[in-house]
Amino acid sequence: MTISSRSLLAGLALLLGVASPRSAVAQSAKAGAKTPAKPGAASVGAPTSMSVKRLPLAVTDIADIVTLEKLEDRRDYDAATLQRISTAKHPELRRRAALAIARLYDPRGRALLRAMRTDPDTAVLATVAWATGQLVDTSAVAWLDSLLQGTKTPVGVATEAAGAFGKIRTSDTRLRLSLYLGNATAGPRTAPVVAEALLAIGRHRERGAIGAIVRWAQSADVELRWRAAWALFRNRDPAAIPDLMALATDPSPEVRFWAVRGLSGARADSSDVGSAGTRPVLLAALRDADRRVQTEAVRTLGSYSDAGSLIQLTLLLNAEDMWIATTAAEGIGSRGDKSRAAIAQLVSSTESDNPTWIRAAALSALADVWLAAALEPATAMAKDTSLTARTAAAQVLAKLGVGAREGLESLLKDSDRAVRATAWTGYLSLADTADELPLRRVARRGAFASQDVAVRAAAAASMAKWADASDIPTLLAAFAVALTDSALIAQESTIEALADIEQRGGGAAAAFFAKYPVAPSDAVYGFAGRGFGAKTIAAWGTGRPVRTTRTDADYQRIVESLIIPVYNGGPAPRLRWETTKGMVDTELNPLDTPLAADYLLQLTAKGTMQHVRFDRVVPNFVVQQREAETNEPLQRDEISRGRLIRGNLSWGSNIGNAPRFPGRGPGAAYDTGPAVYTFGVTPQPHNEGDFSALGHVIRGIDVVDRLELGDYVKSVRVLKPGEK
């Protein structure tokens, strides 16, 4: 089977032709290499430089686009308006209507999409297929399958039909994907469809036949092989172990790191090979020339229970590469007290002469292995000048209890709100050694009266495990005060405490919704949804309150200054992120994510994007900053057909297909969150349909790879046209 990567990339460039008209960051063979982008070298799904001739937009067309942006931003499902624009003469209006229907995430939109299934425009029909998947329309399976299997279906349409089957996750759709992959012939036309079908079948949770996936693992095209490796890794089927072992020696590191990630200990032990057979493959991967492969080998080794693996992980705590060292620490911690032999080395790794990230990771692992052994290093790190060190110390000290009083007291006035909240939670919990609940409540009385939102948040959080119906008035009063705060942490913690009371005996939800018959804010709707589940919908309905300051003039400005210029072939806005590790340039995608692009540009213009810490760094996955502002309005996460490639710029919030968020509530599944900007270090197929492709890195992906926990965004500015 031979399909050239160039053919696959060219096909996907055509099907994603609505994206920003500039080239994406190259996928270098070795992560971190400063390799310039070459024609045809961009990762699949990346915006690709191309000239697209589009029909001009009339004044009335622009007005309709303005209307759609307003409906999306205000979460207003206006059926009549959507139906009218979905039947407009101009194909771009129909395409954008399909986008809006999907993003509004209202089941009524399925009927509008059904009426669009015969659209003559390929880009529109592809968007309809994509939107049908977003709305998880199980009644559309036969139609989507006809597109997938049809020999005359345009490539872009068939590709989106395959992608939709990765969101409508049923036994039937998995079988249809398997049949397609088993029967598809190799060639330039089928390559993009096969690529998407491999990712789609990998998103299915239930196991099934893997032969059709394995078939493409033998392709000469690396773009198909890594997708096959990813699908086999995600499948979790022990039967795939031999195939993953073979792929772990593939010439491409893109293939190898996904394959190595799939060789987990439990999975190997359930296979005919056994962990004794897979462990040598991991040890070989530790010597790989590519740090991504090494990192995944360390991560996977953490799932093995043998003494030899523990010894190897312990040695790797001293690795110079922080991806390797911190991943080793996490692996040791995941084994719990079975890692006691590593205690001395973990303690040593917390000492001040080590890099801060490994100190924090080692302390967290030490607490997981033997909590008492973490007391002394945590107390010392509580006085550290590094926020990363103090954050880790606060989290561990809060778990320790009475013996941690000294360390907790040193953090009660910390300059960081999150550290203070964690420390106060642990400190107030010291009173819980008393069996009498009245004594515990007295200990929190002063905290609830504090002017510091972190202290009040901690007061609620610290009593969540034992509070009962008699505490409901106190928590409701605390919530009323929290509504006046600029930060949201006290609102969230009081609702969580009330939700815990509700779970233990009931009464809290009724009292809360009686006092607040209307959701006080967009954020509170989300907190209550996660806490009280269906009772939130019963009380407040399915419509989250919308908090936006955008006026009609703003929507007009966004369309005229961001959408129309790029639609007409102009350059997209580019931003330069100056970080503590170097410079990263990104290009935005205002054609499909105009609201998000405008919001980021507004934050940049007013100087908000300065000295913003990277609070979450997962080696070979993501680099994510904390919120740029407190009490931000929830942003519309503009999910689009742009793929989540390596170097993708998104934010750490998501609309979420409903099955992704089972349990206690609709909060996460209904909308978005604050703009926690995130760089994707790897492609993230499992998140397709849940996160926006806001932009992508065009320069500095090696800098992204070097960012560590605690690094900062120093500043962000807009690049001038032509600026290098």
Describe the function of each predicted region.
Residues 26-55, 723-724:
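Compositionally biased, proline/threonine/alanine/serine-rich low-complexity intrinsically disordered stretches
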Residues 80-83, 112-114, 143-147, 176-181, ...:
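Buried hydrophobic core positions in alpha-solenoid tandem helical repeats
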Residues 452, 473-724:
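Cyclophilin-like peptidyl-prolyl cis-trans isomerases
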Residues 53-76, 92-106, 111-115, 125-137, ...:
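Structural detector for internal amphipathic alpha-helices that build alpha-solenoid repeat scaffolds
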Residues 89-90, 120-121, 152-154, 189-190, ...:
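Short inter-helical turns and helix N-cap capping residues of alpha-solenoid HEAT/ARM repeat scaffolds
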Residues 10-19:
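Bacterial N-terminal signal peptides
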